[in-house]
Amino acid sequence: MPDEVILTPHPGEMSRLTRLPINEIQSDPLQIARFYSNKWKKVVVLKDAHTVIASPSGDVFINDVANPALASAGTGDVLGGIIGGLVAQSVPLLSAAVLGVYIHSRSASNVSKNVGVSGLLASDLLSEIPVVMEKLRNS
């Protein structure tokens, strides 16, 4: 695996990567993300209601903007695209992960105000992402 990698598993994927039971991952996602980020020497974005972002240096961030709409199919791919786009603009990996998770969750919150959390499609996020990014640039 290349050195410059951001992993973005949800608990089920993290279970397959680590061979830990899903309930163990969900019971302490902060410590699990921190441990495996250090072990693998990779940035880990452990997606769940409160997404945990961990770096190999031990820094850990928690996104407290929980949105059940992000549990729908394809939203993780949108997150990967946001993070990848930031990395392509030379944003450092950890910063790209933290910022990407924030942009993703804020976009979902904004969209779900109009369509609700149960009707959100991953593609609904696409028009809101540049709006959130522009607000960040201007703040």
List where the protein language model places each region:
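Short, well-structured alpha-helical segments that form the helix of a local strand-helix-strand
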Residues: 29-37, 93-107, 122-130
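Short beta-alpha connecting loops at secondary-structure transitions
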Residues: 17-18, 64-70, 80, 84, ...
